[in-house]
Amino acid sequence: MRVYIIIWIILSMGFRAAAQDKLLVAGSGNPNILLLDKQTGKVEWQHALEKGEECNAVALTQKGEILYSYKRGAKLVTWDHQVVWDYKTPDKTELQSATLLQNGGVLLGICGVPAQFIELDKKGKEVNKVTLNLEVERPHSQFRQVFQLRNSNYL
């Protein structure tokens, strides 16, 4: 049985009620991204992942769009499931982490040889790239989550 990795994001914007009453959930092995009512556990919205889209990170943008990473890329989608942008990674890489930046952009953590941290603008276009030699040959073993600190360093 697959272990589900649940990523909880307390929504910064309301969706049919106060943000603290909702939970945006995704996980490795779960075929959907879900918006749950915390009180009732009722699914209020769901986005079906495409075959092979193992979601390990999900977030709600300031505009109210849903950002998520999948094994071979990251997507930004609307509540009506329209794809705003889809960033695909090269062969022999994995994308485990997609996090929001303070400027409204996105930070991607791409596992591969070499590994890369890539910053995208709000439209999904590359604006910065950092290449890393982690001395770990298997991309799947490199890292899971990447964040940018207020001083612009990466964690």
Where are these regions (language model features)?
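Bacterial Sec-dependent N-terminal signal peptides
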Residues: M1-Q20
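Secretory-pathway ectodomains
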Residues: Q20-L155
